[in-house]
Amino acid sequence: AQIVKLGGDDGALAFVPSKISVAAGEAIEFVNNAGFPHNIVFDEDAVPAGVDADAISYDDYLNSKGETVVRKLSTPGVYGVYCEPHAGAGMKMTITVQ
């Protein structure tokens, strides 16, 4: 599985790393790294055609350090992801599915 931290070790409001590539069906573990409230929203305008962004998003907040959400993406292409409360601070990432 690929691990993506929600929040940098230095407290930055960021996905770490901000770009990953995965094989179709490979697990992606999103882990709250800092204890700030974060969520994982797939941008409906930045996912491959036919993908339901709402179905793969995790709108609830991960509030505690160590809380984890796992997603598996099966459709190849590029996915844009953001954290709703911190998108204005630039908390966004790109996932490429091979």
Swiss-Prot record:
InterPro entries, alphabetized: BlueCu_1, BlueCu_1_BS, Copper_blue_Plastocyanin, Cupredoxin, Plastocyanin
Domain of life the protein comes from: Eukaryota
Function of the molecule: Participates in electron transfer between P700 and the cytochrome b6-f complex in photosystem I.
Species: Ulva arasakii
Membrane topology: Peripheral membrane protein
The keyword Transport appears for this protein: yes
Positions annotated to bind Cu cation: H38, C83, H86, M91
Cofactor(s) for this UniProt protein: Cu(2+)
Primary residence: plastid
GO molecular function: copper ion binding; electron transporter, transferring electrons from cytochrome b6/f complex of photosystem II activity
NCBIfam families from the UniProt entry: cyanin_plasto
Compartments in which it is found: Plastid, Chloroplast thylakoid membrane
Family to which this protein belongs: Belongs to the plastocyanin family.
Gene Ontology cellular component list: chloroplast thylakoid lumen; chloroplast thylakoid membrane
Pfam families to which the protein is assigned, alphabetical: Copper-bind
Keywords: Chloroplast, Copper, Electron transport, Membrane, Metal-binding, Plastid, Thylakoid, Transport
Keyword Plastid: yes
Plastocyanin-like domain: residues covered: 1-98
Protein name from the UniProt record: Plastocyanin
